[in-house]
UniProtKB/Swiss-Prot annotation:
Organism: Mus musculus
Pfam families associated with the record: WW (PF00397)
Basic and acidic residues bias (residue ranges): 38-50, 158-174, 182-191, 226-239
Subunit structure: Interacts (via coiled coil domain) with RNF20, RNF40 and UBE2A. Interacts (via WW domain) with RNA polymerase II. Interacts with MTOR and other components of the MTOR pathway including RPTOR, RUVBL1, RUVBL2, TTI1 and TTI2.
Name under which the protein is recorded: WW domain-containing adapter protein with coiled-coil
Any one GO cellular component localisation term in the record: spliceosomal complex
N6-acetyllysine PTM positions: 302
Swiss-Prot/TrEMBL GO biological process terms: chromatin remodeling; DNA damage response; mitotic G1 DNA damage checkpoint signaling; negative regulation of proteasomal ubiquitin-dependent protein catabolic process; positive regulation of DNA-templated transcription; positive regulation of macroautophagy
Mod. after translation: Phosphorylated on tyrosine residues.
Annotated segments matching region Disordered: 1-138, 158-352, 428-541
Span of domain WW: 129-162
Amino acid sequence: MVMYARKQQRLSDGCHDRRGDSQPFQALKYSSKSHPSSGDHRHEKMRDAADPSPPNKMLRRSNSPENKYSDSTGHNKAKNVHTQRVRERDGGTSYSPQENSHNHSALHSSNSHSSNPSNNPSKTSDAPYDSADDWSEHISSSGKKYYYNCRTEVSQWEKPKEWLEREQRQKEANKLAVNSFPKDRDYRREVMQATATSGFTSGMEDKHSSDASSLLPQNILSQTSRHNDKDYRLPRAETHSSSTPVQHPIKPVVHPTATPSTVPSSPFTLQSDHQPKKSFDANGASTLSKLPTPTASLPAQKTERKESAPGDKSISHSCTTPSTSSASGLNPTSAPPTSASAVPVSPVPQSTIPPLLQDPNLFRQLLPALQATLQLNNSNVDISKINEVLTAAVTQASLQSIIHKFLTAGPSAFNITSLISQAAQLSTQAQPSNQSPMSLTSDASSPRSYVSPRISTPQTNTVPMKPLISTPPVSSQPKVSTPVVKQGPVSHSATQQPVTADKQQSHDPVSPRSLQRLSSQRSPSPGPNHTCSSNASTATVVPQNASARPACSLTPTLAAHFNDNLIKHVQGWPADHAEKQASRLREEAHNMGSVHMSEICTELKNLRSLVRVCEIQATLREQRILFLRQQIKELEKLKNQNSFMV
């Protein structure tokens, strides 16, 4: 405190006015009660320049002053001035108390804010640091608005061009949000900040707030009067409707949507509201669910499963989130279904639509509309019977015939009871045969994986699955989901084998077969991931045909004669033992071969050394022979000389 008092006298004697700009840190650190406005602009300037924390750890705008000034005691005034300037800069946006705390702002990874529900949604910046964030809006003493840049300390009357560019960018992104595919994102970060959008700001840019896991329901969204709290599945603070029958506790499933619209980490709740619900489809466009016919966003995005019937026919699926159909009118909502084993990547747009009665994706999209038209035209028929028809008619052929009758003659041209009997006959025909589900039969109540057009393989979730237990409201048999099994390449054939092995026509809970979709293009692509659900009471799992499908497509005549049971004895053998044996034999052969080769190499070296010795001995002998010849010549000369002398 003594040093603090001495510094205070130095700063107040005019030295601060001369050298304040060159030493902003000194002015920032020791600005006190007598100088509430001296370090005011320097708070603005040094907040960005001297911030030690990276931008993805704390919010730049909502940095709490307590983090920086907590070591000294006389800075209450500076804190108030700083928070007041932050509020003035944002044009009077009032912050929620959670937003100004350090533990909350450390959870965010983008520069977005969360405002009170009564105000407009606050702005979203595109990057972790945007140059438009330096500008703030103030009101001058004459009452006019002016804009101040805290980094360059420039004031001007007109709106800064960074703001105009950002508004233009966000408007364009809002226009393109319906048709655009998601960019490659950091999906872990997206799980952490489950973002929820408010799609009803008319004419303004699309703004959303990143919510952390500790947010309360009132500041997760900027709600308008038309929003309904029941449509947002909030994490850890869900607003359950009064008749919520089933809750599925599953691990977070990522929705990489262009404008994030659903909360990925939420436990999904089935809500039976008897009122028209607003819901967000996978591309962020909000669609009113009163429409009984498929709107323009329905073909581009493969609408949800068939809606489960009210009353005793309560079908609860372990992986899907079906909305219950109300008694007054069917509301086909556009909420995308999420399975625990498949991440719905961006829906495939129907750029080239195949013929109507051959593309099973169109069958899937037309199901809610067909239900609605059935109920509108046959108001005296029980809606559960219609749902039974559409549930039981899972084969391609029967669904083709039903939809063909719908499209040509209308629903009044045939009898509903005949359809029910036909579907029951189909299901009883295929029930005794214990065949595994085909990958492309049009099952109206099973989850599927969307296939991104950029990546032609199905995107599967890498999060390990917990066993999903869902308890239906009527029957008490839980269903457990078995883990994912890869299947071989499956071709996208138009007509498939009529298999309804798991379907019961009675009011027991239907065990949904997780038959997954390939892309809308009719071409062979890598096979989907199968998840098979079975009743936990019987604990029987439908056998997966791991490599049953041949590479070529089955013609209808071949599909009629094809039987999985005939080739089941050669499928799925445990290969671990054979692989271990083969690897052991390979290693042994390798070791024996190396030993043998090393022996041969040593023998070769020995023989080469012997050859070298022989060569050396041969040269020595030659040298000796030459030497001896030389000696013989010399001796003969000496003989001759001696003979002459004698």
